[in-house]
């Protein structure tokens, strides 16, 4: 891509010649604290058959949060991942194609928790002045997602493509990420 990425500041080392990151966040299950007083603090608690928790998740074939959940579970439970999925299965109300549909169903009260990001409550606080939505913090930690952009082969010779890639790392672009995409910027903004 030949884009200067020296100002990128991520929780991981980034060395990629094709993809340029533009934001990042950690996956989490979001809940309504007025309805769910004791949220799960681990996948073990989430999948425990002694609770009646209900979940909405996204399809890993069509949604990056869905794929992120698959990888998150695999990173923690490795060869025992199937056991967690078996325990989670009866709790899953639906598997949506994407994040928007899943989050909308959650807001309508269709489930106790929805797969989203640790930053999702910030939207409700800042845009709606609503503090009841929280991220369930898991003892195992949370899986990182870095959203990226790339120049296609067709756009490789297009100056506008390269200019846009530079723009996504600019202060003007990065400074609006926290309150428009509700994720963390990849550069240090003021």
Go through the PLM ranges and name each one.
Residues 25, 85-89, 95-96, 128-153, ...:
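Periplasmic-binding protein-like
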């Amino acid at each position: 891509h030949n884009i200067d990425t020296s100002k990128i500041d991520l929780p991981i080392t980034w060395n990629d010649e094709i993809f340029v990151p533009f934001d990042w966040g950690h996956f989490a299950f979001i809940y309504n604290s007025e309805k769910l007083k004791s949220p799960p603090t681990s996948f073990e608690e989430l999948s425990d058959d002694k609770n009646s928790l209900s979940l909405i998740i996204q399809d890993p074939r069509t949604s990056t949060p869905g794929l992120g959940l698959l990888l998150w579970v695999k990173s923690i439970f490795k060869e025992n991942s199937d056991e967690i999925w078996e325990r989670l299965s009866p709790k899953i109300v639906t598997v949506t194609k994407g994040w928007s549909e899943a989050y909308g169903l959650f807001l309508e009260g269709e489930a106790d928790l929805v797969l989203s990001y640790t930053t999702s409550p910030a939207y409700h606080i800042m845009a709606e002045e609503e503090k009841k939505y929280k991220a369930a913090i898991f003892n195992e930690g949370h899986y990182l997602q870095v959203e990226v952009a790339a120049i296609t082969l067709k756009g490789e010779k297009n100056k506008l493509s390269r200019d846009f890639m530079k723009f996504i790392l600019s202060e003007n672009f990065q400074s609006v990420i926290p309150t428009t995409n509700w994720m963390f910027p990849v550069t240090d903004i003021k």
